[in-house]
Amino acid sequence: MFMADAYLADTVWYVGQIIFIVAICLLVIIVVVAFLATFKLCIQLCGMCNTLVLSPSIYVFNRGRQFYEFYNDVKPPVLDVDDV
């Protein structure tokens, strides 16, 4: 009877160890997946910042330069004081 109790205690201990190891592995997996999801979200936010901030500002800068060059091409020359 004592031997059966010893085997049962050992079995419970081994099962407890297995459950503990599985729980630790699951916890590590959850932490790693959360970190990777956070990293991916940061990358997506940087891409959105590029789309919403950087690209329009470059577009506005280029259009402004085009309008400035066009204006300089079509504006009449400055009159000299003698011509007035």
Curated annotation (Swiss-Prot):
Virion surface side: 1-18
Cross-referenced Pfam families: CoV_E
Membrane-traversing stretches: 19-39
Residues on Intravirion side: 40-80
GO biological process, one term: disruption of cellular anatomical structure in another organism
Entry keyword set: Apoptosis, Host Golgi apparatus, Host membrane, Membrane, Transmembrane, Transmembrane helix
Cellular location(s): Host Golgi apparatus membrane
Protein role: Plays a central role in virus morphogenesis and assembly. Acts as a viroporin and self-assembles in host membranes forming pentameric protein-lipid pores that allow ion transport. Also plays a role in the induction of apoptosis.
HAMAP family: BETA_CORONA_E
The protein's name in its UniProt record: Envelope small membrane protein
